[in-house]
Regions:
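Short acidic, hydrophobic short linear motifs in intrinsically disordered regions
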Residues: 39-53
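Short amphipathic alpha-helical elements of helix-turn-helix/winged-helix folds
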Residues: 33-37
Length: 249
């Protein structure tokens, strides 16, 4: 069911942005290093991250305890990082392949902005939670190159101030858990009607604007990517993916 007076994608980002973590320059470097080391496909220990940053392991442990980093990190029993900021080295719903290595993302949105941080093209495969149909995307550092099926959409949930900045468990269960790719708008509407959630919306390639804001706004100066994230790519039907229509979740 469509929600009356749905937000535009710009309006959504204006609402979401204040809730996202900000990073100091040294925290940006740690965050980008975490993403890039995780993209190698295995858990990260302090020594590995220290080598990547050229600093002592003791300094790494202190940096990982900063609130902005800690609230986006989860680790195994030995303290090795298994996931950070939407990227995981352990299985989740959204498969995210980079350079032939199998990774996963916490939600559908993560797969749109992380390629820019990694400076790598990702092949995404994510089951529609309503029908089981696999939504496939090729996402480069600068654009969404292809989407199949062409009518695919992505759902979003309105941000809650109590979610962000608390814990990884909260972010995943109360935010990421409602952000999926659907093979069609109708599928998304059906899924959220059944779930009886009332604050989700479907957007599409318009989210390129949002992923640019996140990747550049949070990690500006640490990503090292030139160029623009505008455009949908020759293989992506932006009109289909940018309806901006809303669904009741």
């Amino acid at each position: 069911m469509l929600v009356p007076n749905p937000p535009t994608s710009d309006g959504y980002w204006e609402t979401l942005w204040p809730h996202l973590r900000s990073f100091s320059p040294d925290e940006q470097r740690v965050a980008v290093a975490l993403y890039r080391e995780l993209s190698k496909g295995a858990a990260i220990d302090d020594a590995q991250l220290a080598r990547a940053l050229g600093i002592a392991p003791a300094e790494i442990r202190a940096l990982l305890q900063r609130d902005s980093i800690k609230s986006l990190t989860y680790a195994d029993g030995e303290g090795r990082v298994l996931g950070f900021g939407g990227l995981a080295a352990t299985p989740m719903h959204h498969r995210f392949e980079v350079d032939g290595r199998e990774l996963w993302t916490w939600c559908a949105w993560d797969s749109l902005f992380i390629p820019e941080i990694l400076r790598r093209t990702a092949h995404v495969a994510s089951p529609d939670p309503e029908t089981g149909e696999i939504v496939r995307l090729v996402v480069s550092p600068g654009e969404i190159k292809s989407v199949k099926p062409a009518k695919a959409v992505i759902s979003f949930i309105r941000p809650d101030a109590q979610i962000f900045g608390t814990s990884v468990a909260n972010v995943i269960s109360r935010f990421c858990h409602f952000i999926f790719f659907f093979a069609s708008l109708e599928s998304g509407e059906n899924a959220f009607a059944l779930a009886k959630r009332f604050n989700a919306h479907n957007f599409g390639a318009e989210l390129l604007v949002g992923r640019q804001r996140l990747a550049r706004g949070s990690f500006d100066g640490s990503i090292g990517v030139a160029g623009s994230s505008r455009g949908s790519g020759s293989g992506c039907d932006a009109r289909r993916l940018s309806t901006g229509r809303s669904i009741r979740a």
